[in-house]
Structures are given as structure tokens and as C-alpha cells.
Amino acid sequence: MIPRSYSQAIALTGLMMLVGLASSARAEVQEFNRRATATAQIMAGISPAGSDLALERRTKLDAFVEHQKWMAVQWSQARGRISAMQDWRSREINIPGTAQKTLLYPFSGPDFLNAYTLFPDHSQYIFFSLERPSSLPDLESVTPVQFGKLLEDVRNAFRDIFQRNYFITDYMSKQLTTPWIRGTVPVMATMMALMNQRIIRIEPVDLFPELTRAYEARDTVKHPRMIMRGVRIVFVSAGGGAQQQLYYFSVDATDKALEFYPGFLEWVGQHRPASALLKSASYLLHDNQFEKTRNMILAAADYVVQDDTGIPYRFLHQAPWQVRLYGRYNKPIKSLRYGYQADLKGAYKEKSDLAELPFPFGYHWRGKQSGLMIASR
């Protein structure tokens, strides 16, 4: 059974979000959830400061000492890339009124790292992809041996994003379904800890509870292959300031699958003004199976940062959009050759003054081969 009015539900949800953000902005120093923050810090290889003695004891174990060393080395290398991204962002990304903007990040996986590095001042972030959100692990309940396996799973989940600056979907299906690390929430929370954020709360979100109940019944109605699950993470910088929030939804975003959730893209698209981030997206928006998602982004966003795997260049190389190109264009990797864009290749050839992109972005991550575009209107 479909709810009588999606628009009413969507309007109410949006109002509640705005009220919450407005009230949080008044406080300079925010209280935070110490257990959730400490859990994220331990997974990030950071010894948490505080009075949570149960978790503090975990940091004395050899497994944590080993994990801390590994994370320190990997994060030190990643910090060089992030610093280059931050410097580039300060010069090239100029968005007025960012404190009231939403970042849309389709096919995101748990990639808070790139989203927050490029768009740190947005008030909220909306991610969606196939991977389940799940929840933080309970570090107090696991044995020392299990704790060691959990930290090993964290390292496995971070190898690709640290090395390549993107996640590999096929690998994530295994990395985020272990007995100890399940879903995107543990990875996003760990990234928040690495970026010096404090978690205020993590809570499930169900945009369409009537649909969820109907689809979970299964014997009463035709149901989707995967039922949408959502989560909201409210967080704040360790240095204080206004709260920010991240919505993450696991959903099949093909046009056919979205027929089961006809209000989802309407809900996402109502959050304006919006920016959009698209990277390492397997050229999904080049496929007519994702036409609804592509059209939603083109309608809702007035600022898009993407590599060549995002919205096809032909949709942006026209009024009212203005496009700036960075780095270089390379043919898609072997398994994704169908994403080749002759018009984008030509646009790069016409530019004689293109600066190298000083960080890896997308599938061509080796040897300064990456390209990126900013489209604005």
C-alpha cells in the first residue's frame, strides 16, 4: 500500500530537518555521544580521550597497538592527498551560502572522506548506494581475539580508499558483511574520527514506513529485491561550531527499482540549494536505466563536481551550465570502455592551459592521470 501523500510527508520531514539544524547552529560547543565517538576513534587507530574505561582498556591490547601503527602510516599518506585536495578546493570551489546547502552524493558507498574534504561547510549530506548502513560494532562485548579480527576487517575496508581514493563495489560486498564490520556506518564513523569530528547521534531513518511494512510482509504485495534502509548521523567538529548531518540510504537507484519507492528522488531533490558529487560511479548515469536519478541531479543541483563517470558531458555542455575542466581525459578503464565520451575528449584537446589535478580522483589514480570537472549555473 502506498501512502496517500508523499508530498506532505516530504514537506514535514524537510521542515523538521531545517528546524533541527537552525537550533543546533546557535551553540558553539556541542555535546556528543562519547561511546559512539570513542568507538569510531578506536577503529581509526586513535586513543580516545575520556572516561569510557571499558573502551580505554581495549587500547592496551596488542591488536590495537598494531592497528594504530598501520592506520598512522596509511593516514599520514592519505593526509598528503587530502591536503592537496583542500588547497585545490580553497582556490577552485567557490559556492555562496554553503552553510545552508546540501550535498547530494549518489553511488557514494561510505565515502565520507572525499565528500567532507571537498564540501566541508555544507549543512547536510545525502548519500545513497547499494550497501546496507547497519550500525557501529559493540567493542565492549567482543573478546580480545574478536577485537583483533574486527580491527583487521577495518584495515581491509580502508585499503582501497587509502591507496586509490575510491572503493571497489565488488570488494565492499565482502568487506562490509563480515561478522564484525557490517554496513557503511562503521566506515563512515571511522572517517569522521579521522577528520576530527565528534558523533552526536546515529539513528535509523525510514522515509516510507508504510511501504517498509508492506514490503517486509512479502506475502501481501509485490516487493523490491532490496528494501530501502536509512540512517542519519549527526556530527560536529571537535573544535565546535554548528551541527551537521549525513543521511545515508541503501537503495537500488535503477528506474525500475525506484518504482517501488516513487517518493525517494522527490525527497532527495527537495533539498535545495544543493551541490552534487559524483566519482568512480561506473558510468551508471550514462545508462538510461538511471535516467530518473540523472534528471533529479540536473534539476536539484546548481553545482556539480565529478569525474567522467558521472553525468555525461553532453548534458552539462549546454546552457545554463558552465563547465571547467581539470587534469586530463583518459579512456575509461578496460571493464568500463562503454563510458568513452568523444565530446569530452575533444573538449580537453581544445584547452591548451589545463592545469594538472594535484590529487587522484576516480579510476585513473596513478601518475597524475586523473580528470575532474566542475559544472555550475
Task: Give the label of every model feature segment.
Residues 1-13:
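Bacterial N-terminal signal peptides that target proteins for export
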Residues 13-15, 25:
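Cleavable N-terminal signal peptides
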Residues 21-27:
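Sec/Tat signal peptide C-region and signal peptidase I cleavage site
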Residues 28-159, 237, 243-377:
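Non-globular targeting/processing and membrane-anchoring segments
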Residues 108-120, 126-127, 164-189:
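Short, thiol/selenol-centered motifs that function as redox-active sites or metal-ligating centers
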Residues 125-175, 200-220:
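Thiol-based oxidoreductase modules, predominantly thioredoxin-like and allied folds used
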Residues 155-162, 186, 190-196:
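Long, charged/polar, surface-exposed segments that mediate recognition or autoinhibition
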Residues 192-266:
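Active-site/pore-lining binding-face segments in mid-to-C-terminal subdomains
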